[in-house]
């Protein structure tokens, strides 16, 4: 079997950033998948499931309620390796195109207080596995990167 595209990225040199993972075409519709890499793979500790789960709930809620991107959001969810998230949008985008959106979203995550949306037994199959303070921490940390993001953090390393 051939490796899938995401397994051909050199995870030994990959740093936190926002990368176009792939673009798929369905008829005339382009779908862009983004690799939102929050930690340095195999270098930094991965995020724990509780904060990943919380970021997923907050990020998905933010995106599905966004004035511009709500109807373009196909999916937002964690990578199995717990080093980041995938964001799938309808449209042909570059990493630069979505930096403003991600700045808004991660500020929302960093500043969020109160009940995590969907964190109830009726709404979620693992609602007790949440950690809002750590989600706030990761939101602040990634916001700092987004505020000063450089080109090398917007394109996969060779």
UniProtKB/Swiss-Prot annotation:
Protein's UniProt keywords contain Glycosyltransferase: no
Protein name: S-ribosylhomocysteine lyase
EC number: 4.4.1.21
Catalytic activity entry: S-(5-deoxy-D-ribos-5-yl)-L-homocysteine = (S)-4,5-dihydroxypentane-2,3-dione + L-homocysteine
UniProt entry keywords in alphabetical sequence: Autoinducer synthesis, Iron, Lyase, Metal-binding, Quorum sensing
Pfam family for this entry, one: LuxS
The protein's assembly and partners: Homodimer.
Record-linked InterPro entries: LuxS_sf, Metalloenz_LuxS/M16, S-ribosylhomocysteinase
Cofactor note text: Binds 1 Fe cation per subunit.
NCBIfam families (alphabetical): PRK02260.1-4
SUPFAM superfamilies, alphabetized: LuxS/MPP-like metallohydrolase
Binding-site positions, Fe cation: 53, 57, 124
GO molecular function terms listed in the Swiss-Prot or TrEMBL record: iron ion binding; S-ribosylhomocysteine lyase activity
Cytoplasm found in the keyword field: no
PANTHER family cross-referenced by the UniProt entry: S-RIBOSYLHOMOCYSTEINE LYASE (PTHR35799:SF1)
Free-text function comment from the UniProt entry: Involved in the synthesis of autoinducer 2 (AI-2) which is secreted by bacteria and is used to communicate both the cell density and the metabolic potential of the environment. The regulation of gene expression in response to changes in cell density is called quorum sensing. Catalyzes the transformation of S-ribosylhomocysteine (RHC) to homocysteine (HC) and 4,5-dihydroxy-2,3-pentadione (DPD).
Cofactor(s) this protein cannot do without: Fe cation
Protein's GO biological process: quorum sensing
Transmembrane residue ranges: none
Family stated for the protein in its record: Belongs to the LuxS family.
Enzyme class: lyase
């Amino acid at each position: 079997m051939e490796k899938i595209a995401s397994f051909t990225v050199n995870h030994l040199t990959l740093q936190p950033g926002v990368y176009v993972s792939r673009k798929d075409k369905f008829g005339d519709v382009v779908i862009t998948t983004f690799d939102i890499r929050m930690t340095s793979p195999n270098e930094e500790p991965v995020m724990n499931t509780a904060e990943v789960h919380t970021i997923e709930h907050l990020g998905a809620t933010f995106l599905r309620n966004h004035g511009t991107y709500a109807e373009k959001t196909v999916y937002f969810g964690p990578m199995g390796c717990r080093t980041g998230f995938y964001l799938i949008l309808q449209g042909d985008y570059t990493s630069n195109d979505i930096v403003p959106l991600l700045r808004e979203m991660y500020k929302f995550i960093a500043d969020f207080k109160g009940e995590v949306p969907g964190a109830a037994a009726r709404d979620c199959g693992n609602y007790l596995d949440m950690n809002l303070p750590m989600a706030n921490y990761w939101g602040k940390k990634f916001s700092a990167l987004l505020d000063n993001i450089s080109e090398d953090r917007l394109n996969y390393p060779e």
